[in-house]
Amino acid sequence: MAVKLKIKKGDSVKVITGDDKGKTGKVLAVYPKTLKVVVEGCKIAKKAIKPSEKNPNGGFINKEMPMDISNVAKVQE
């Protein structure tokens, strides 16, 4: 049975637990099957990029990673 999620893409949320506790941001993506959300500017991870035609040297990028939906609360706008 599917769970009805109260948080949608584009909502403003506040992180209530974890390393980014207290930060607010916009929801960039919602994953209902795994009950995870991606919040702008929170849970940043450094990802390695292989060399390609666009980026011949490769390198690293900072990317927002999904966090559990129970770790965020919707904020009134």
Curated annotation (Swiss-Prot):
Keywords: Ribonucleoprotein, Ribosomal protein, RNA-binding, rRNA-binding
Superkingdom of origin organism: Bacteria
CC per GO annotation: ribonucleoprotein complex; ribosome
Gene Ontology terms, MF aspect: rRNA binding; structural constituent of ribosome
Entry-linked SUPFAM superfamilies: Translation proteins SH3-like domain
Cell cycle among keywords: no
Keyword presence, Ribosomal protein: yes
GO BP, one annotated term: translation
Job description of the protein: One of two assembly initiator proteins, it binds directly to the 5'-end of the 23S rRNA, where it nucleates assembly of the 50S subunit. One of the proteins that surrounds the polypeptide exit tunnel on the outside of the subunit.
PANTHER family given in the database record: MITOCHONDRIAL RIBOSOMAL PROTEIN L24
Family stated for the protein in its record: Belongs to the universal ribosomal protein uL24 family.
Alphabetical list of HAMAP family matching this protein: Ribosomal_uL24_B
Quaternary structure note: Part of the 50S ribosomal subunit.
Protein name according to UniProt: Large ribosomal subunit protein uL24
Organism in which the protein naturally occurs: Campylobacter jejuni subsp. jejuni serotype O:2 (strain ATCC 700819 / NCTC 11168)
Upper taxonomic lineage: Bacteria, Pseudomonadati, Campylobacterota, Epsilonproteobacteria, Campylobacterales
Gene name linked to the record: rplX
